[in-house]
């Protein structure tokens, strides 16, 4: 015992990192305390994620995986090994990434959290089951024992369905929709191209693209006049066009080769609807689906009503309801319902019921602690926000009470209202109390204040970052003059940057008004949005912000501008002179490594033209097209201009490494030899310039008027640290949003509305200041801005706030307060208002 105690007393207290050089890290040495919460702060691009994920997670997970067989490792995604001299005393590590993948069509909140597994087990083992003759048998232990059930009414013997038979991704799937809850239906409104055209002139769109041109001749043989405008046909004729029977007709037709001889044959009539249905049945790939999709619309499955379950799976009843009805409940509602399950069963079944229900409730508690009680189990996974998916990921990782694990959290505050962050902090403290260590990368001062130790990276981004500029407790960082986050942690900074617009002037430029009916958990709304102002939509997670703005306002405005029918739940909308609607969201830009910052910002094309005019290029006969790393002669022949090559390593996953020929520059050796000399006498090749960040490239491009102007816009957007050759799919959500804005800056925008969905994702408080300046510049040019946001500094600088709530799910969905930040802070109903003080 004495030896064991002595060993524990001498146990290491910190992870020791020595000589870390991942990405932009400058050979740093740093100690990360064990058994506590450590925050890693710093401006965007300063090296926070490089330290947390590139070093700590890569080493912690890599060493654990090395203990597994090569056969097992081959089937696991592995982080690249860190470029570091030494990492000592690191535990096995789990990482929760900033942007979890968007789930597929078969995923729901219930499947993603595995709550549905527990629910299926309940309905299989504990429910009343229906016999083949329609009689219900009371709950029995025979189901768990694998025995047959006997109907007390008709005496028939049968087996209860297993949990597998209650899965909509397996045997319990609805036969009509295959377990997706949605079916493709023919969109009749898309079948007629133009009612002023005749059928001979191509009025029936599917017959032009999906069917032989002879169908107009067959239609004529069906008794339909094909030489008059479609609108002038009788109802009977239109019925034949849309839904006529598939009968054979003997027709005469003129061959397309110009021959005067008429052909004749027997041909089956395919109505417009049948044409689309026939083409859909034959679809084998995405290309084929694309041809048909313009004539289709998605509708709720008429058989399962969107529940995804088969009729058989919907038959078992527990506490008076079926499994599909249980899935329609929110997490908060079903948690209360599950608590009552054991008491509703016979005495002998209660121990088993308490075990099954207890497991369900433990999983549910972790999710509810993270503020997800408003989500229903049948909510489609693809409709969940980034923050919701990240909290699901966190709940999955922490529900097993492990000890001695290093949890690396990459911006866990994404998408969280200040009130939800309190729940997140509670989960992190629980992890530490179980003997784990937590490292979190974040900018949110509310969550950073919970850390026992903070490591701040910097001082700036990219090549100007990668150093530890400050470390210590929250109080020590707050007093450290070298720290950039310190004043935000201590609260010693001005909150309001821009002047307050008087209440009577808020709507002086106009008003966009929208009325909606109920949808999801959102109640009927009557919203007024001031034109030419910065409006921030706030509220706790699930309060209806996304539904109001992204699912109602945007489709409503687009329909009104196109002169089309409004969506069913959008009752009326007044655009107030708006002609352009631009959604600036955080979806990745581009889908492969060929999309870079320079190409997206329209800088690369201009640089290619400039380099093609250089003396070296003219001597060798190179044109602008030759400088393209996608198709040009000067691209690297080894990697074909991607900058990376993929290695097929036997027994292990494929490994991507920088191209050994161009070292990631994407260009061949000939491109290196063509150098452009600026007015300062500095010479750079295009590959060298593409490897520079925006700030340094600006210094070289001062005499290139158009390039300089476009690079200055990127710098003003706070993207000066990005290299010109950086791949756009790898940018953070916040970086992607600001890059999308680059082409919009400096224009008159009086008729444009910009809608931002949480633009502060990944932004340091200093970067938020830059973003606010961008917002103000757009407003000064006449733009109307609507921002869905949780960041308190953005909310405090709004001209107008629409606060949704008061809670999430069924407890939200209403506009509970509108007005200036001061008015929201004074509102007793507003949860957001509680966190807005101080305002200045």
What residue spans do the PLM features occupy?
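Conserved phosphate-binding elements of NTP-dependent enzyme cores
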Residues: 1-840
């Amino acid at each position: 015992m004495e030896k064991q105690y002595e060993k524990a007393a001498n146990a290491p207290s910190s992870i020791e990192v020595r000589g870390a050089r991942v990405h932009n890290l400058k050979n740093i040495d740093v100690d990360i305390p064990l058994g506590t919460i450590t925050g890693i702060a710093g401006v965007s691009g300063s090296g926070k994620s490089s330290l947390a994920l590139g070093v700590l997670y890569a080493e912690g997970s890599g060493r654990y995986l090395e203990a597994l067989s090569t056969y097992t490792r081959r089937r696991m995604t592995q982080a690249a090994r860190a470029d570091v001299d030494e990492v000592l005393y690191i535990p096995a590590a789990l990482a929760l990434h900033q942007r979890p993948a968007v789930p597929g069509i078969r995923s729901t909140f219930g499947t993603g959290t595995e709550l549905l597994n527990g629910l299926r087990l309940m309905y299989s083992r504990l429910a009343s089951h229906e016999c083949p003759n329609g009689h219900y048998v009371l709950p029995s232990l025979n189901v768990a024992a694998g025995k047959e059930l006997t109907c007390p009414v008709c005496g028939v013997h049968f087996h209860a369905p297993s949990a597998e038979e209650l899965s909509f991704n397996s045997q319990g799937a609805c036969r009509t929709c295959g377990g997706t809850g949605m079916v493709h239906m023919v969109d009749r409104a898309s079948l007629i191209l133009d009612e002023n055209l005749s059928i001979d002139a191509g009025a029936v769109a599917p017959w032009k693209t999906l069917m032989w041109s002879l169908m107009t001749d067959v239609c004529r043989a069906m008794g339909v006049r094909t030489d008059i405008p479609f609108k002038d046909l009788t109802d009977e004729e239109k019925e034949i066009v849309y839904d006529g029977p598939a009968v054979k007709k003997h027709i005469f037709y003129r061959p397309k080769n110009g021959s005067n001889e008429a052909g004749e044959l027997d041909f089956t009539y395919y109505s417009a609807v049948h044409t689309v249905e026939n083409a859909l049945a034959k679809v084998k790939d995405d290309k084929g689906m694309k041809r048909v999709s313009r004539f289709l619309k998605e509708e709720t499955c008429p058989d399962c009503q969107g529940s995804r379950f088969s009729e058989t799976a919907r038959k078992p009843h527990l506490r008076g309801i079926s499994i599909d009805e249980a899935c329609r409940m929110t997490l908060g509602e079903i948690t209360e319902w599950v608590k009552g399950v054991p008491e509703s069963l016979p005495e002998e079944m209660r121990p088993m019921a308490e075990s099954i229900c207890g497991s369900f409730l433990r999983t549910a508690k972790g999710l509810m602690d993270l503020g997800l009680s408003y989500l229903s189990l049948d909510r489609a996974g693809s409709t969940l926000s980034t923050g919701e998916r990240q909290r699901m990921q966190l709940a999955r990782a922490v529900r097993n009470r492990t000890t001695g694990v290093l949890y690396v959290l990459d911006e866990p505050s994404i998408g969280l209202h200040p009130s939800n962050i309190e729940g997140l902090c509670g989960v992190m403290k629980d992890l530490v109390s179980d003997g784990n260590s937590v490292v979190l990368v974040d900018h949110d001062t509310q969550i950073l204040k919970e850390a026992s130790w903070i490591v701040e990276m910097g001082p700036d981004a990219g090549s100007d970052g990668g150093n530890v500029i400050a470390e210590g407790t929250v109080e020590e960082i707050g007093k450290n003059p070298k720290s950039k986050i310190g004043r935000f942690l201590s609260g010693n900074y001005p909150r309001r940057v821009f002047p307050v617009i008087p209440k009577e002037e808020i709507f002086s430029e106009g008003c966009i008004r929208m009325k909606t009916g109920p949808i999801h958990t959102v109640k009927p709304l009557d919203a007024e949005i001031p034109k030419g102002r910065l409006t921030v939509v706030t509220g706790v997670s699930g309060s209806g912000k996304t539904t109001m703005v992204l699912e109602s306002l945007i489709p409503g405005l687009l329909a009104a501008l196109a002169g089309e029918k409004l969506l069913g739940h959008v009752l009326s909308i007044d655009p107030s002179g708006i002609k352009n609607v631009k959604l600036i969201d955080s979806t990745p830009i581009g889908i492969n490594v060929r999309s870079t910052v320079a190409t997206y910002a329209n800088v690369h094309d201009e640089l290619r033209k400039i380099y093609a005019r250089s003396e070296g290029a003219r001597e060798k006969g190179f044109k602008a097209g030759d400088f393209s790393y996608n198709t040009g002669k000067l691209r690297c022949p080894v990697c074909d201009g991607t900058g990376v090559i993929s290695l097929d390593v036997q027994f292990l996953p494929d490994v991507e490494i920088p191209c050994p020929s161009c070292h990631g520059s994407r260009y061949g050796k000939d491109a290196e030899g063509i150098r452009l000399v600026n007015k300062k006498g500095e010479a750079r090749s295009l590959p060298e310039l593409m490897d520079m960040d925006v700030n340094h490239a600006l210094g070289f491009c001062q005499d290139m008027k158009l390039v300089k102007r476009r690079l200055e816009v990127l710098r003003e957007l706070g993207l000066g640290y990005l290299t010109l050759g950086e791949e756009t799919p790898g940018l953070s959500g916040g970086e992607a949003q600001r890059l999308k804005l680059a082409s919009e800056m400096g224009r008159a925008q009086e008729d444009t509305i910009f809608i931002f969905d949480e633009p502060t994702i990944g932004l340091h408080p200093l970067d938020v200041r830059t973003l606010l300046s961008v917002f103000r510049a757009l407003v000064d040019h006449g733009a109307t801005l609507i921002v869905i946001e949780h960041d308190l500094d953005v909310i405090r600088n709004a001209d107008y706030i629409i606060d949704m709530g008061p809670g999430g799910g069924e407890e939200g969905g209403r506009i509970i307060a509108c007005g200036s930040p001061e008015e929201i802070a004074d509102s007793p109903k507003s949860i957001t208002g509680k966190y807005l003080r101080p305002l200045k």
